[in-house]
């Protein structure tokens, strides 16, 4: 029997990050995939990033993950969403060449020491005394492991729907994992079903592009990862089509054959990526919906029509697509479909993403009730880090809602659970001024260095950057008066106040380039300059949050632990006890984020938790 420290099940976006980070930390790791040739495949849209999602990509990258570098290696269209708003809510997004993205992931996986790819279906978990000890493959092969990370995506009990058609599978043309799903249900883990969908693919040669408005790539040469020196591929434009009254009429006429409306699909789909049937049913008064036509590659004629995810019958899909201007002659190469799949209630997980009831078993990605490549990648990274840290005996630095979107997502999942596929949004983060996409390295790379998941190239880059930042901050500590700035051609109001140059950067008239008389002519990295200028601009707001943040971290340090006796806490009403027992918060801070928990209930919890801790010390 082959022996591993970590076994990762599934080669999607969660699986590759989990396996890669565990191997980077020095754990002997197996990545098990149905078909190794599909590792890193983009199952749905050929894009990475977006609002909230782009923050996750940058955070995974800051911990030396794969997704951002693969996105840059395959990007054929860059667009910064929300560019007109503050940087805290801007969303970097790239359109990727689907084949090149997968190739980039597979190249990094193949080059990673201590990472071994195994082809096959995981049919069962190996368990001893309630703890996971490895996996059994469908061909009879057994793999021993000290921890297992499940990253099954939509393959866990997956079933595909298109009109009246029904097929087993997690993705078109690929099998689903029914035996593993049955074992998890038999273990009495809390499970449910969710659904997602994908639009039809179109042959781009049959689109009349000249009649459609173009959406070009951004001119300024930003990249997803700071380790990418320049964009390696030529850029293409996307185009925008639009549904119309005729389109809506066709869709309504096909609803009686849609599995969403016949009752064949009972699971809830993603709120922020609804099917076109659902859009027309819910928003029938609108005169049209945008459809973004996104090329899937430089040497691939396939186009992804973003905005028309559907499980309507193929003939209805053809009529729907051809009803739109510019698409009258469009040829569908692969019809759209919906997929329904099993997921675990994420409230059954610790914040490490370890299953509470089965020590050594971790879950990441859509199995936890999320949707999206970026959410999956972030969970895979966190689960892999925690699994490797546990196996290798390392202390895991704490991530919390004030230092990462990843922690916001995991806290939301493990505390509140899901009733629909969870998507990251900037609005979910209370401390989003601290969690900008462009400062992810400053926030998280030191944590990665502490846990040992950062490679040599990023370590050298970060050390050089930290030294440059130190030099810049030293220069910006110099004081200056309004008169001195005016003499340098900077038109600030002459209020007589003497401020540090860092404080002066809060004023809109002052830029770092304008302060060259003080800081010299060192050519600082533009991304570092942008980050420092924004740190200065946001400083007053961040200072106001400091007291709140201290309270958060202090209450996070009051553990409640598994099996906390909420019913024994004096002063808690029956309603409070029921809410707490349902959510099973692991700290006082987590209890405070449960809907309906009152300040009085938290005060009672605090007193009881401290008494228990004191009694445990005495004992």
UniProtKB/Swiss-Prot annotation:
Its cofactor is FAD. InterPro entries: FAD/NAD-bd_sf, GIDA_C_N, MnmG, MnmG-rel, MnmG-rel_CS, MnmG_C, MnmG_C_subdom, MnmG_C_subdom_sf. GO terms for biological process: tRNA methylation; tRNA wobble uridine modification. Keywords: Cytoplasm, FAD, Flavoprotein, NAD, tRNA processing. One of its GO terms (cellular component) is cytosol. NAD(+) binds at residues 269-283. FAD binds at residues 10-15. Coiled coil: none annotated. It is found in: Cytoplasm. GO terms for molecular function: flavin adenine dinucleotide binding. It holds the Pfam family GIDA. HAMAP family: MnmG_GidA (MF_00129). Homodimer. Heterotetramer of two MnmE and two MnmG subunits. NAD-binding protein involved in the addition of a carboxymethylaminomethyl (cmnm) group at the wobble position (U34) of certain tRNAs, forming tRNA-cmnm(5)s(2)U34. Belongs to the MnmG family. PANTHER family: GLUCOSE INHIBITED DIVISION PROTEIN A, PROTEIN MTO1 HOMOLOG, MITOCHONDRIAL. This is tRNA uridine 5-carboxymethylaminomethyl modification enzyme MnmG. It comes from Novosphingobium aromaticivorans (strain ATCC 700278 / DSM 12444 / CCUG 56034 / CIP 105152 / NBRC 16084 / F199).
């Amino acid at each position: 029997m082959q022996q591993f420290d970590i076994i990762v099940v599934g080669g999607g976006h969660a699986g590759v990050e989990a396996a890669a980070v565990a191997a980077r930390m020095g754990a002997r790791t197996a990545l098990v995939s149905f078909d190794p040739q599909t590792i890193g495949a983009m199952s749905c849209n050929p894009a990475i990033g977006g609002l909230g999602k782009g923050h996750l990509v940058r955070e995974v990258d800051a911990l030396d993950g794969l997704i951002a570098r693969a996105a840059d290696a395959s990007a054929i269209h860059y667009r910064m969403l929300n560019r007109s708003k503050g940087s805290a809510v801007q969303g970097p997004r790239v359109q990727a060449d689907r084949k090149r993205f997968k190739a980039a992931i597979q190249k990094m996986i193949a080059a990673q020491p201590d990472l071994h790819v195994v082809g096959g279906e995981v049919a069962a978990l190996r368990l001893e005394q309630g703890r996971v000890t490895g996996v059994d493959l469908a061909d009879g092969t057994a793999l021993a492991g000290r921890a297992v990370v499940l990253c099954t995506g939509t393959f866990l009990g997956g079933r595909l729907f298109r009109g009246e058609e029904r097929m087993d599978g997690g993705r078109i043309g690929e099998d689903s994992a029914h035996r593993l799903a049955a074992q998890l249900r038999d273990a009495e883990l809390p499970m449910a079903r969710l659904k997602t969908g994908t639009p039809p693919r179109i042959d781009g040669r049959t689109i009349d592009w000249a009649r459609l408005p173009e959406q070009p790539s951004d001119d300024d040469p930003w990249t997803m990862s700071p380790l990418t020196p320049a964009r390696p591929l030529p850029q293409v434009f996307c185009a925008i089509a639009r549904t119309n009254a005729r389109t809506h009429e066709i869709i309504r006429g096909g609803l009686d054959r849609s599995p969403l409306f016949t009752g064949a699909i009972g699971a809830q789909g993603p709120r922020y990526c609804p099917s076109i049937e659902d859009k027309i049913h819910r928003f029938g008064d609108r005169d049209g919906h945008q459809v973004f036509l996104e090329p899937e590659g430089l040497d691939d004629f396939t186009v992804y029509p973003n905005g028309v995810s559907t499980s309507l019958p193929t003939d209805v899909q053809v009529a729907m697509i051809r009803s739109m201007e510019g698409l009258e002659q469009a040829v569908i190469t692969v019809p759209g479909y919906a997929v329904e799949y099993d997921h675990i209630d994420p409230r059954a997980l610790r914040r490490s993403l370890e299953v509470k009831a089965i020590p050594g078993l971790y879950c990441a990605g859509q199995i936890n009730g999320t949707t999206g490549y970026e959410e999956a990648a972030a969970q895979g990274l966190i689960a892999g880090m925690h699994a490797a840290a546990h196996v290798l005996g390392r202390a895991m630095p704490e991530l919390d809602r004030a230092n990462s979107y990843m922690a916001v997502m995991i806290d939301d999942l493990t505390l509140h659970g899901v009733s629909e596929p969870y998507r990251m949004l900037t609005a979910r983060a209370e401390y989003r001024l601290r969690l900008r996409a462009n400062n992810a390295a400053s926030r998280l790379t030191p944590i990665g260095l502490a846990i040992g998941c950062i490679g040599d190239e990023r370590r050298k880059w970060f050390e050089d950057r930290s030294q440059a930042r130190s030099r810049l901050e030293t220069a910006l500590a110099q004081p200056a008066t309004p008169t001195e700035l005016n003499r340098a051609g900077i038109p600030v109001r002459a209020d007589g106040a003497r401020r540090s140059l860092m404080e002066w950067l809060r004023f809109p008239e002052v830029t770092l380039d304008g302060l060259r008389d003080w800081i010299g002519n060192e050519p600082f990295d533009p991304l570092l300059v942008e980050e420092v200028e924004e740190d200065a601009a946001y400083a007053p707001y961040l200072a106001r949050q400091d007291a709140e943040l201290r309270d958060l971290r202090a209450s996070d340090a009051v553990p409640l632990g598994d099996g906390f006796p909420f019913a024994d806490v004096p002063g808690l009403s029956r309603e409070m006890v029921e809410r707490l027992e349902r959510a099973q918060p692991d700290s006082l801070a987590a209890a405070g984020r449960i809907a309906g928990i009152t300040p009085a209930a938290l005060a009672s919890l605090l007193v009881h938790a401290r008494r228990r801790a004191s009694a445990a010390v005495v004992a």
